[in-house]
């Protein structure tokens, strides 16, 4: 049984028993290749969420009308990626086993792999929808296969061809894009094709895991991330994409790669809080 966290994300104070979504944090950034700090993302999102309203004028919905339980952050071993992933998988599996939707707060993007490992064990026909600036399809990065630069490649190892759908991708090496052309459903630069994909996912009624790397946003809107990439989407474009894809059968999700100390203005953290609020509302009240 999970116990109440000390500092919750705003409006997420339901009991575990009544919750439809359970938040859990993975403060891990040990494989960061450029600018570290994503381990501080989950705590910053919770703390700064109190500058945000529970009500969304975009959706005319309020978190106080929803049942969300915030279980706090996992205690992860920074020196062992595999150990951290095992702990993340265990927490996600527990939440799924209890019939609830696990929503993970990163942390660097590698943390997604632990959640996907749990999800694919319950849903063998799982699909992943991936919003990101980076393809994350390297087979290894500097010899390490468990790296934030390899997370979608490791997910492909679990799911196989045609079940990973990538959007906003605008960075990666040549081999990653060649791999994507053969093995994933890649949509470069923006959300073109997302509506058509969502229509198909709904018709097929397949389980979907949604992973959002916040560096899909343009650095002008979201500079506080480890590997910023110019040419990203706007907040409103991301909000529209969230409202579209959550019409599908979302069984798990994550929001990752906020590094709050890299943006002293606090704008990036405030944006991450708003993305999380809109995602929660879109999933729970569709």
Predicted segments, located by residue:
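Conserved alpha-helical scaffold segments that buttress catalytic/binding sites
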Residues: 1-286
């Amino acid at each position: 049984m999970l116990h109440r966290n000390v500092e919750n994300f705003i409006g997420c104070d339901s009991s575990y028993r009544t919750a439809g979504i359970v938040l859990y944090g993975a403060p891990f950034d040990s494989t960061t290749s450029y600018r570290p700090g994503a381990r501080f993302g989950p705590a910053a999102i919770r703390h700064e969420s109190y500058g945000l309203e529970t009500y969304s004028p975009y959706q005319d919905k309020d978190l106080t009308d929803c049942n969300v339980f915030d279980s706090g952050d996992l205690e992860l071993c920074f020196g062992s990626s595999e150990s951290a992933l095992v702990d993340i998988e265990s927490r996600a599996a527990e939440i799924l086993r209890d019939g609830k939707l696990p929503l993970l707060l990163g942390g660097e993007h590698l943390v997604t792999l632990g959640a996907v490992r749990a999800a694919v064990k319950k849903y063998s026909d799982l699909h992943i929808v991936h919003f990101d600036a980076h393809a994350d399809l390297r087979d290894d990065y500097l010899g390490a296969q468990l790296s934030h630069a390899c997370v979608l490649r490791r997910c492909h190892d679990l799911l196989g061809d045609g079940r990973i759908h990538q959007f906003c991708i605008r960075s990666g090496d040549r081999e990653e894009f060649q791999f994507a052309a053969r093995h994933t459903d890649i949509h470069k630069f923006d959300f073109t094709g997302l509506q058509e994909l969502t229509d198909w996912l709904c018709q097929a009624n397949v389980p979907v895991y949604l992973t959002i790397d916040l560096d899909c946003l343009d650095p002008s809107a979201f500079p506080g991330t480890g590997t910023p990439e110019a040419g990203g989407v706007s907040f409103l474009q991301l909000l529209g994409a969230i409202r579209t894809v959550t019409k599908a059968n979302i069984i798990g999700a994550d929001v990752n790669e906020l590094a709050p100390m890299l943006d002293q203005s606090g704008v990036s953290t405030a944006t991450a809080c708003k993305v999380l609020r809109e995602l929660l509302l879109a999933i729970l009240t569709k």
